[in-house]
Curated annotation (Swiss-Prot):
Keywords: DNA-binding, Repressor, Transcription, Transcription regulation. Residues 8-68 form the HTH tetR-type domain. This is HTH-type transcriptional regulator BetI. One of its GO terms (biological process) is negative regulation of DNA-templated transcription. The gene is betI. Repressor involved in the biosynthesis of the osmoprotectant glycine betaine. It represses transcription of the choline transporter BetT and the genes of BetAB involved in the synthesis of glycine betaine. It comes from Escherichia coli O17:K52:H18 (strain UMN026 / ExPEC). Residues 31-50 bind DNA. Pathway: Amine and polyamine biosynthesis; betaine biosynthesis via choline pathway [regulation]. GO terms for molecular function: DNA-binding transcription factor activity; transcription cis-regulatory region binding. Signal peptide: none annotated.
Length: 195
């Protein structure tokens, strides 16, 4: 009989091991055997909890997107009466949370983005994440701008966030958070009306 609570512990071990494997050898070269070895479990455990490698990769992407959602929501909940500018910066800062800009997370996101073009489930998850970001940004800009301008500003800020993130990921260096904050803050203030 399995120990109570073991499923969540095992799932976490396997997701963490998957992130480590992707970080070290890439998604396509990360095998079930390597992941199981890193997690200290048998390959059968992966099949038991996730069916196969694709199921494990999907769960890993869901985990990363959940961490992103939580990072943004925690910052927004801390600003219930915040201005549009403050809330937009909170969304930006959530996207640059350590859970999203660590080496392992960045490599995993890049691998998932590339694979999402060929795997419908990963594509769907990527689209949900992208739409959520754009929706949050447009909603906050719309507090101060007409709908069309809010959509354009939201799209521009989403592109800036993705661009800063992608440049950092491809450089192999940590994201320069002060620079990212400064550039995104400048974009936000340039698009919001002044009092």
């Amino acid at each position: 009989m399995p120990k109570l609570g073991m499923q969540s512990i095992r799932r976490r071990q396997l997701i963490d091991a998957t992130l480590e494997a992707i970080n070290e050898v890439g998604m396509h070269d990360a095998t079930i055997a390597q992941i199981a070895r890193r997690a200290g479990v048998s390959t059968g455990i992966i099949s038991h909890y996730f069916r196969d490698k694709n199921g494990l990769l999907e769960a890993t992407m869901r985990d990363i997107t959940s961490q992103l959602r939580d990072a943004v929501l925690n910052r927004l909940h801390a600003l219930p009466q915040g201005s549009a500018e403050q809330r937009l910066q909170a969304i930006v800062d959530g996207n640059f949370d350590e859970t999203q800009v660590s080496n392992a997370a960045m490599k995993a996101w890049l691998a998932f983005w590339a694979s999402s073009m060929h795997q419908p489930m990963l594509y769907r998850l990527q689209q949900v994440s992208s739409r959520r970001l754009l929706s949050n940004l447009v909603s906050e800009f719309h507090r101060e701008l007409p709908r069309q301008q809010a959509q354009e500003a939201g799209y521009g800020l989403a592109a800036l966030i993705d661009g800063l993130w992608l440049r950092a990921a491809l450089s192999g260096k940590p994201l320069d958070k002060p620079l990212a904050h400064s550039l995104t803050r400048h974009f936000i203030t340039q698009h919001l009306p002044t009092d």
